[in-house]
Amino acid sequence: MFKYIFKGIPFLLLLIPNLVLAEKLTILHINDHHSHLEANSRMGLDLDGESTRTKSGGFPAVVTKIKELRSENPNSLTLHAGDATNGTLYFTLFEGEADAALMNVVCFDAFVVGNHEFNNGDQGLVTFLDYLNEGNCQTPVLGANVQPEVGISPLAKSSRDDYIQPYTIVERNGEKIGIIGIVISKKTKMSSNPDDNTMFLDEVSTAQKYTDELNSQGVDRVILLSHFGYENDLALAQKTSGIDIIVGGDSHSLLGDLSDLGLKPSGSYPTMVNDASGNDVCVVTAWEYSQIVGELHAEFDGQGNITSCMGTPHMMLADSFKRKNADGERVEIEEGYRDAVYSVIKVNPSLSIVEPDADAQALLAGYSSKIDEFSSKIIGSVSEDLCLERIPGQGKSKMCDPSKTAKNGSDISNIVAQAFREMSNLSDIAIQNGGGTRVDVAAGDYTLGDAYTLLPFNNTIVELSMTGQEIK
């Protein structure tokens, strides 16, 4: 009886051509690691109802998690949504070599250039991409709206696609998938340092143009690998048609059900919106600094439309958990409390204790030993904690209560601006953008490494003559 029923199912599918099994795709992704190759040793989480200090992420832990998820999903895509470089001494000293070496352990299926990839001009980006191309991965580098001048820019000595291409097409489970890359345009031109003749086109119209081009080639499963920011991605999705998934970066947005950990997510993982034609679009991004690996599972119908999206932002933790004792010192928690923390981690799908990949860790050690020697020199002392806030009272400082910055803004940013003014004998004022200073500064000895972590970008101080009316 049963064998005839099962024999009849393929025959039934032939009679009903529109009855097609859902196609599944898994995407693993990171973004904005900004040369943060080591673990964050100051991650604060609420675990079992108490504030707990742990270590999170680091690129060797990213490698471990991606290997684990790939073994569970053999046909997955692995994507990087930009700003791989700039932000720590790993870039300052090695100009992208260390980042490229660790990225080539993963072998990403595509990488979109971010705005900070242009901080050292087109030639600086070429240097990084040459390192990236030294390995066996040959990761496609995307940027559909990046227009280097052919014959002038080192990015385009012979053609516009010498280093950066608008999209790549991959195949998974017998289906072609187009991956388009875009980078935030105005911000890159205004706050980074691309060559003067390198242009950046409108993000929305560029994304639509290449989606249409892929569709005309019969590719109707389209991923936008976007370094445009979470809110911008949501808006872009609603203004365009034909994009199925947006894997984003730039805004350092944390997504997922993580508020119980004391974190402040910007939205759900994934976030679902409708495009201009009413079709579903999945939007994801994976926070910052090698601390989260996103795992997105999408399903398509026979026409290439999204029917389902679900996933998990994975935060990788070290097996180290500290809390303040009666003297205010952070110490490793005792066994009974540790078991309670383990129980919290076990039931939270976003948390896992991850051992760094040994090969990646050994590779990183070759660079970190040189950094340790350079950065350990003490150059001063700090008498009190100095808060970092881009917006007064925003509450993103990892060290200070928002009330401390609500009136006068970021302590350390103001001090940096004052230092710039004092360096110039002629200046009446100095302006420092809030995003140019990157970390809180703790009281105590201050090292050369601390200074580079605070001000990691190769910016140039310039003097301008302006009227008071011109300054806004």
Label each residue range with its predicted role.
Residues L25-L28, R53-G57, R70-N73, N215-Q217, ...:
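Non-catalytic terminal accessory segments
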Residues A22-S320, D411-A419, A430, S465:
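Acidic, metal/ion-coordinating pockets
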Residues I16-P17:
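N-terminal signal peptide c-region/cleavage motif recognized by signal peptidases
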Residues M1-I9:
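Bacterial N-terminal signal peptides that target proteins for export
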Residues F11, D196, T460:
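Generic anion/oxyanion-binding catalytic loop in active/binding sites
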